[in-house]
Each structure stands twice: as structure tokens, then as C-alpha cells.
Amino acid sequence: MAELRTQPALGRIRQVHMVGIGGIGMSSIAEVLLNRGYDVTGSDLERSDVTERLEAEGATIHEGHAAEQVGTADVVVYSSAVDPDENPETREAERRRISLIPRAEMLGELIRMKFGVGVAGTHGKTTTTSMAGLVVAEGGFDPTVIVGGKVTAFGSNAITGEGDVLVIEADEYDRTFLRLTPSLAVITSIEEDHLDVYEDLAAIQASFTQYANSVPFFGAAILCLDDPNVQAIVGDVERRVVTYGTTRQAEVRGENVRREGMTTRFDVVVRGERLGTIELHVPGMHNVRNALAAVAVGQELEISFERVRDGLGTFTGVRRRFEKKGEVGGITVLDDYAHHPTEIEATLDAAHQGFPDRRVVAVFQPHMYSRTQNFMDEFACSFFNADMLVLTDVYGAREAPIEGVTGGRLAERAEQFGHRAVHYVPEKTDLPGRLQELVGPGDVVLMLGAGDIWRASEAFVELLENDGGTAIERD
């Protein structure tokens, strides 16, 4: 671990207690605070490899929640998964008048201390943040990077550098990204989502516009011109705008895209000047756009193209983003976080690029009842590029069930729209056995969803390994 800074920057705050510290977002903040010399304590419902890693770095972590675990904390930070009115630790903080803040507010404080690069968007945030972090690191800035997923090149979901640049994933859910004031505000895409929070697309666009306008006068909004809903807000952004994409009007443009298996190459043209070729070790046009956002960040920080190219060349993926879980008996099993129709279409496109001439079997666990209800028909049509679709029931997350909103109903709609190979497996635990009956050598099994479908992917790989890598021969 890097040498600790001995002068904390949060006033007289010395001890930070984090409720829900094991979550992907909270744990990255904890790493940064530990690196800056703070005394970090925390709690979560259960221990994990994440909490073990934080304890190895100096945190004190409790399993379960109890009022006394707040201890002598100067501030208590709570996860978005925690109800502050119900949790005993947040209620204890209120009783004792200890500062009690949500995760997003702590992120805002961290970004205030540095030159912030915020990456927002309905799709592509995690990958783009990771790519931008690698570019900034290769540029010699020794950045701090906070990502909503474990990055293969980091070995973690955070880099705790000693430099003055902070690259951070900015989440639009519950408008939390409006607490951030980055110097560079990236917007990768805008689409209808989180309709439990936003009234409609116009409200989502207004929120992203406010985010873009939060940058200081010396900063810039970096916008993807390939996205029609981002195009629509360009005229409302009151700060300097830098555009990127594959369209001819983008200032940072990708051209001559060559897609060969798991490798994607494209040429970079910046304001009419051809700089050279980028080679990515991940498939999909969506990753070309993600990389172009990182190129634009590099341009703003005056990082040489060679450094940008080398930084992107080290990117090999993020956990649960087209992650290979195993290959047994000629069956390849992948896991991906895609949980929106547009993301599903992009991931299926990447699968066919990465594994040409192979059958792609999509296994989808819908995430949240409201999202499934709002996008039922869009989901049903998003799987036409899958040779076979296997559906299980909805992962409710924070929501109660909605009558008539099930994986079975989605399966019916997919068939009604014309998909010719749809299977419904209500119980997720039954997926491994059913998949063993449905797939065979040469198939690519792509598990999709933001819930716990990854458990089924691991169980399926284990089942194949235990059975000697064989699937049941299909007709």
C-alpha cells in the first residue's frame, strides 16, 4: 500500500464509520479514505472477500449492524442500500448528533479535493471510468480511481493514487451524481431507466444537463454525439463541450473500425488530425465509444496519444462485464451485468463478434419489477440476436412484486414477437441442470442481469466440470 498521507483534508474528521462497507461503491471509498490516513470502521450483513481486503488494509469491520458499533466515529456514511430511518447504526448517529451522510455526499467531498473526472451515463459508466483511469494513470498523473466494479487491470474496484486527479463513476440513480462537481463531466449515453425515480425521459435529460453544467468555468462536458438523447442536450449545456463518437461531427472520432474476434481496432481522428490506431482487447462497438470517451479525457489532460493508446491497451475488462466464467467441454460461459434492452443488444453483438460462427444462448434474469414492466416489449425484442433465450424470474432488488410482471410473461412476449427458441425456468437454482439439457459443445452461454444470475453461471460451470465437461446431447 502507498505511504499514508498524514494530513486528512476533511476538517477535523479523523474516524469514519461506514454502514454497508462491503458494497462495491462503499468499499472503494473506504480504500481511498484508508490511503489518506483516516481511521475507517464499518459494518455489513456478512463478511466477504471485499471486507477481508479492507481489513488487511487497516479497517475495522463488524458483521451485522448494532448501535454500539458506531463507536467514536466523527462521521457516519451509509450505503444507498441502507434505510437510515431503520438501521440501528444510522439511528444511533442521529441520536448522538454525529454527522450522518449518504455515500454520494462523501463522493462529492472526495471529488472536491482533487481535479475530478466524472463519468455518467445510462450505459457504459463502469467500463468508461476504468478505461479513463488507465489512460490517466499511463499519463503519469498517479490518479485515484473509484469504479462501480472490479477492474481486472486494477485487481480491485479502486486505485488509491497520490496525484491530484480523481476519476469517478457518477451514478444517475436517485440523482446522486448531482452532488458531484467534476472538472470534466463525461456523459456516455442517456436513455429511459430508473423510472421509479424519474418521471420520464425529459426529466432524465434535465438531470444530465444539470450534471454537465456543474463543471467549473475551466472544465468541460465530454458528450457522446452518437447517442441521440445526448445530442438533444448539447445546446442546453452552458460549459465548454467536447464531443466524441463515430459520427463525422464528433471532435474526437473513431474511424475504420476492424472487429476480429475479441480484438477491436480503430483509428482516432481529433479535430481533423489522424493520431493513430487504438487496439482494444474487448469486443463490441459500445467499447469503441467507451474508449473514445477515455481518449477525449486524455486530450483534455494533454496526455500524448502514445500514452493514451498504451493505457487502453492494458484494459482487459471489468468483473461482470463480458466476464468469462469458464470453458468446459467446448461450452463457453460468460457473465454480464446488462439489464436494459440497449445493453442486452450491445452485449449480444459483442458475443457474436468475439465468438463468430458459434451459437449464442442468452440466459436472462430480469432486474426489478418496475423496469421489467416499463420495458416489457423492449426486452422481448432485444434478444433477437440470441440463437436461444432462457428466462428465469425477476430479481426484485428493493421492490415488491407487481402482479403479472414475471419472467414467464416476458417469455410469452418474446415468443409473440417472433423469437423461435424461448425457454422459461422459473427458479434460478434450476438453471444449471436445464442448461445442461439445452446446450452443447460449441455453444456460448451468456448470463445476463444485474441481480444474482452470476451465481447460476458459476454453478453451471461447476456442474459441467463435475460431469466431465459433458452436456446432455440435444436433439
UniProtKB/Swiss-Prot annotation:
This is UDP-N-acetylmuramate--L-alanine ligase. InterPro entries: Mur-like_cat_sf, Mur_ligase_C, Mur_ligase_C_dom_sf, Mur_ligase_cen, Mur_ligase_N, MurCDEF_pg_biosynth, UDP-N-AcMur_Ala_ligase_MurC. GO terms for biological process: cell division; cell wall organization; peptidoglycan biosynthetic process; regulation of cell shape. Cell wall formation. It catalyses: UDP-N-acetyl-alpha-D-muramate + L-alanine + ATP = UDP-N-acetyl-alpha-D-muramoyl-L-alanine + ADP + phosphate + H(+). Belongs to the MurCDEF family. It is an enzyme of class 6 (ligase). Keywords: ATP-binding, Cell cycle, Cell division, Cell shape, Cell wall biogenesis/degradation, Cytoplasm, Ligase, Nucleotide-binding, Peptidoglycan synthesis. It comes from the Bacteria.
